[in-house]
Structures are given as C-alpha cells and as structure tokens.
C-alpha cells in the first residue's frame, strides 16, 4: 500500500453492513426461498440504481430498496403475506454489521486515518443502520450519494468524497466488497481494496485493484505500515 494515505473510505452496504441480515432475521416466515429472495432483492436494488442513473430518473436508495423488495416478494409469491414487506424494510434499517467491522474502524481511526463512509444510501437509512450497529460512534464522516442525486460508480461521487474530506484521490484507501464500486473508484484514482468474502473471481480489470483480502480484519495489517504517515 502507498505511503501517502490519509483517509480510509468504506462502502456501507455489503462491506460494513450485512445486506442479507434483514431477510435472515425473518427466515422462518419467508421460508425455503429466504436466501434466494435476499439475493434477488439485492440484485434488483443495485440494478435499479444503475438503470435510473442511465435514464436520468433519480429516486433515493430507500425507494429503490422498496421497489426491489416488491419485485422479489412477487417473484417468490410472498407479496400477499401480511406485514412481511414492512417487517423486512424495518429490518433493513437495522442491518447487522459484520463482526469485524467496528474493531477495524477503531484501529484505523486510532492510527490517525480519516475514517468515512461513501454510500449510495440516503442519509436517513444510513444513519438508522449505523446507529443500530453502533458504527456511527467510530466514523469521522458519512457521505451519501443522495447529496448529488446520482449513484456510484459515477466519478462525481468519488470526487465528492475528496472534496468533503479535503484529500486527493491518491491519499484515499477505498474499501468495498462490490467489484463494480471498486472499478469506479480505481478508475477515478483511489487505492482500492476488495473485501472478497465469497472468493469471487476478478472483475473490471480495466480499473486497477490494488489489494484483495477475505475480511475486514485483514485490512488493518495491510495498512498498519502506514500509520506514521497518517498520524
């Protein structure tokens, strides 16, 4: 990792927050299709952010999450299950953090790094989830694409992070589990680290991926050598 790093910027959904925990908490009610429904919900949520961006038809991420869940429930014939959609949406506001998230953020902050989130989520849903997971106590900043009314991986989002944090692209370590996000961030000029929990193959090879680890806990050893530069 380069010596000039000043900020560690994290994606939220899928990186720090487990997007599948909402369905898993309600798995008994959802039934045998719980895992598949959760995967489809996430896929459509992301797809809708990209298609709306291309069509210049912005809607905030909470609305996209709602629309994606509607489709997923219809797909698995659960749309008439009384109260299920409301319970799943409420659970999404309180997603579980990955077990190693808080400790990793605390170590980085103690070492002098600016610790921030850059997310497609709108502020209300982000703040609710971060408060529920207690990650809000560790962050220096939480930046939302909703401020610009566009979604990652548009390069303007990554520039927005630089402007708000007062750093240059080469001074940012950007951490995400999402390959498409890292593709955009890497092409913009961030130093990128992929949290590849599922061991997925490389993607977006036109954009430089600096490092890959299997968990958030592996991030600290990767960055520890730079602590004197960050402080």
From Swiss-Prot:
Protein known as? (S)-2-haloacid dehalogenase 4A
Q: Which UniProt keywords apply?
A: Hydrolase
Q: Where is this site: Important for catalytic activity?
A: 15, 152, 158
Which residues of this UniProt protein bind an (S)-2-haloacid?
Answer: 12-13, 42, 119-120
Q: Which reaction does it catalyse?
A: an (S)-2-haloacid + H2O = a (2R)-2-hydroxycarboxylate + a halide anion + H(+); (S)-2-chloropropanoate + H2O = (R)-lactate + chloride + H(+)
Important for catalytic activity as annotated region, ranges: 176-181
Output the Gene Ontology terms for molecular function: (S)-2-haloacid dehalogenase activity
The organism is Burkholderia cepacia
Q: What does this protein do, in the record's words?
A: Catalyzes the hydrolytic dehalogenation of small (S)-2-haloalkanoic acids to yield the corresponding (R)-2-hydroxyalkanoic acids. Active with 2-halogenated carboxylic acids and converts only the S-isomer (or L-isomer) of 2-chloropropionic acid with inversion of configuration to produce R-lactate (or D-isomer).
Reply yes or no: does the keyword Nucleotide-binding apply. no
Keyword check for Hydrolase: yes
| Enzyme class, broadest EC rank | hydrolase
Residues annotated as the enzyme's active site:
11 (nucleophile)
Biotechnological relevance of this protein: (S)-2-haloacid dehalogenases may be used for the biodegradation of halogenated substances and their derivatives which are widely used as pesticides, herbicides and other industrial products.
Family of the protein in this entry = Belongs to the HAD-like hydrolase superfamily. S-2-haloalkanoic acid dehalogenase family.
As recorded in UniProt, its EC number(s) are: 3.8.1.2
The residue stretches assigned to a coiled coil in this entry are none
Q: Mention any Pfam family matching this sequence.
A: Hydrolase
């Amino acid at each position: 990792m380069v010596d000039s790093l000043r900020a560690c910027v994290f994606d939220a959904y899928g990186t720090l927050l487990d997007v599948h925990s909402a369905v898993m908490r309600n798995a008994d009610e959802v039934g045998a299709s719980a895992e598949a429904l959760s995967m489809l919900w996430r896929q459509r949520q992301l797809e809708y952010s990209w298609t709306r961006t291309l069509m210049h038809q912005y809607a905030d991420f909470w609305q996209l999450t709602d629309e994606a869940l509607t489709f997923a429930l219809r797909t698995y014939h659960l749309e008439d299950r009384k109260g299920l959609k409301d319970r799943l949406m409420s659970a999404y506001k309180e997603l579980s953090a990955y077990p190693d998230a808080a400790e990793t953020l605390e170590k980085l902050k103690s070492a002098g790094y600016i610790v921030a989130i850059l997310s497609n989520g709108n502020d209300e849903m982000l703040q609710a989830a971060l408060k529920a997971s207690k990650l809000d106590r560790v962050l220096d900043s939480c930046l939302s694409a909703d401020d610009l009314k566009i979604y990652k991986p548009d390069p303007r989002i990554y520039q927005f992070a630089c402007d708000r944090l007062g750093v240059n692209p080469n001074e940012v370590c950007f951490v995400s589990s999402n390959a498409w996000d890292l593709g955009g961030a890497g092409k913009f000029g961030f130093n990128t680290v992929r949290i590849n929990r599922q061991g997925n193959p490389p993607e977006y090879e036109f954009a430089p991926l600096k490092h890959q680890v299997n968990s958030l806990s592996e991030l600290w050893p990767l960055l520890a050598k730079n602590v004197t530069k960050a402080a």
